[in-house]
């Protein structure tokens, strides 16, 4: 049975490239304009699952994804995948590279390709776009001289790649998560990750230490922790945490039980296999 996926679009983004790694050939892949729209499509039942980026090894967390998971109608992560982020410089077929005066791309891509741009096109105007795929689409219409994005975008918009792997960090990787409506967690594999949004009742000295101690007490390792503003008032934060292990593992279950005693609220964001 085919699955209907939402993903951060438009077509030709790194998110689509990541989704193609895990989706079946008969699955339906539907592009949405932003992370919020993709996740709302799951909430509304328009799709069964969504794939969205959650962190990048160079740029850090994707704040919109973290905030959407921590608030609104609950959703859970059921899988994750990673994708090496390799940027390409592309132009129209008849464009001479020497004539490039404007380069369009997403701000994150620009920040990861600054050395290449400074060395090869120091006088080019860099134009920000909503996504790398949007830059490629605009280029196909003649809006810019060149675009920086994923190689998959060049195929979509019939563009010529004139330089590949132009990122300053050749080991850049983005982690993506599959998100669904709450249900039964995937079966424990022995190499899992449990994600949580943890809310403290009163922001006080040692609050984070109390949370960390619960995991340390039960020898549960944390692979990710990020504070995010609650939006209620200045200085109030909650924490997004990734713990190694499955919610059905005794150490993780014990740590969660301890957190419930000291935290105002805990939102379970899923237990799922770690990406290979």
Regions found by a protein language model. Give the residues of each.
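Domain-level signature for soluble enzymes in the chorismate/prephenate branch of the shikimate pathway
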Residues: 1-276
């Amino acid at each position: 049975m085919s699955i209907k996926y939402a993903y951060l679009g438009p077509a030709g983004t790194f998110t689509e490239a990541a989704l193609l790694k895990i989706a079946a050939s008969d699955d339906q892949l539907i592009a949405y304009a932003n992370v919020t729209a993709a996740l709302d499509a799951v909430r509304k039942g328009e799709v069964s699952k969504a794939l969205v980026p959650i962190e990048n090894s160079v740029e850090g967390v994707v704040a919109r994804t973290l905030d959407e998971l921590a608030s609104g109608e609950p959703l859970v992560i059921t899988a994750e995948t990673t994708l090496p982020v390799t940027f390409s410089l592309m132009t129209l077929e008849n464009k001479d590279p020497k004539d490039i005066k404007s380069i369009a791309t997403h701000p994150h891509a620009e920040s990861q390709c600054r050395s290449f741009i400074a060395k090869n096109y120091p006088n080019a105007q860099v134009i920000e776009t909503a996504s790398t795929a949007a830059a490629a689409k605009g280029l196909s219409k003649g809006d810019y001289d060149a675009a920086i994005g994923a190689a998959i975008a060049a195929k979509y918009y019939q563009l010529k790649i004139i330089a590949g792997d132009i990122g300053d960090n050749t080991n850049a990787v983005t982690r993506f998560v599959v998100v669904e409506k709450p249900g039964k967690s995937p079966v424990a594999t022995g190499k899992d990750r449990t994600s949580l949004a943890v809310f403290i009742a009163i922001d006080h000295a040692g609050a984070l230490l109390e949370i960390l101690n619960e995991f340390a007490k039960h020898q549960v390792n944390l692979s990710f922790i990020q504070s995010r503003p609650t939006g209620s008032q200045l200085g109030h934060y909650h924490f997004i945490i990734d713990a190694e292990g499955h919610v059905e593992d005794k150490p993780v279950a014990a740590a969660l039980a301890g957190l419930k005693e000291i935290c105002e609220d805990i939102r379970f964001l899923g237990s799922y296999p770690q990406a290979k």
